[in-house]
């Protein structure tokens, strides 16, 4: 009786959400609440629902896709790689909707092993993003104003079809890891040597801070990169991960 009474009180009074948030206390196991209650930001949910819809993924609602971590009602981390296990998606993601730009509190995005060919212009809104893993897709490029992702620390673009990098990449002052191996790059912006990246070293887990092997770089290569001990490094696509 006490539990039933508490539930009724919660639903009628305590658990009402602020405007713009939706209450849901029946969550699947793939949802992690890092901090907060069961109120979820509507715009974040819209981005998830649109991602499901445009790719014809078989999920009942926005909470079904991937592994999601929420912080005070905002989507903080989304793991939606096509790994072939329950941590990612149950089918391939081919495109990202403009509404992913709603995820303005997102800090980690994992989209490996899909078939994504481009990033929507709204991607520039993800200013809190610290980790972007989108290897093993079919990206031909990235957003021009990449510097809008000013908090980016980890950027994995390996195993795509990228043929050119925007100059704006040089303004990513917080970037520590940059993986560009196995793309179609034939040239690089000269300003890359102004970036605060350790071009030749590995971290404590033996991952290189920078790697760019498997491209078509032959001439007009910035000196910091041509002299890098990791110039020809390419990690095995089936075994590496920062996760």
Regions found by a protein language model. Give the residues of each.
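Conserved hydrophobic beta-strand positions in leucine-rich repeat
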Residues: 78-80, 109-111, 129-134, 153-157, ...
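N-terminal capping/linker segments that flank leucine-rich repeat
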Residues: 13-98, 206, 214-243
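Bacterial Sec-dependent N-terminal signal peptides
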Residues: 1-19, 133, 156
């Amino acid at each position: 009786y006490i539990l039933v009474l508490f539930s009724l009180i919660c639903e009628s009074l305590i658990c009402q959400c602020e405007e713009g948030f939706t209450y849901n206390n029946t969550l699947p196991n793939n949802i992690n609440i890092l901090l907060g209650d069961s109120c979820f930001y509507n715009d974040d949910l819209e981005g998830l629902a649109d991602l499901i819809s445009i790719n014809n993924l078989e999920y009942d609602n926005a909470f079904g896709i991937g592994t999601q971590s929420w912080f005070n009602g905002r989507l903080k981390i989304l793991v939606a790689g096509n790994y072939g296990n329950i941590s990612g998606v149950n089918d391939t993601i081919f495109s990202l909707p403009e509404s992913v730009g709603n995820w303005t509190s997102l800090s980690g995005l994992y989209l490996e092993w899909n078939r994504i060919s481009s990033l929507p212009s709204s991607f520039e809104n993800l200013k809190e993003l610290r980790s972007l893993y989108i290897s093993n897709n079919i990206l031909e490029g990235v957003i021009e104003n990449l510097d809008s992702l000013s908090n980016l620390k980890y950027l994995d673009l390996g195993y795509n079809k990228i043929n050119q990098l925007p100059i704006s990449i040089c303004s990513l002052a917080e970037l520590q890891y940059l993986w560009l191996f196995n793309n179609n790059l034939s040239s690089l912006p000269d300003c890359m040597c102004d970036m605060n990246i350790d071009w030749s070293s590995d971290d404590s887990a033996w991952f290189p801070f920078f790697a760019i092997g498997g491209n078509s770089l032959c001439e007009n290569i910035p000196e910091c990169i041509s002299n890098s001990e990791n110039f020809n490094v390419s990690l095995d696509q089936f075994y590496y991960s920062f996760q």
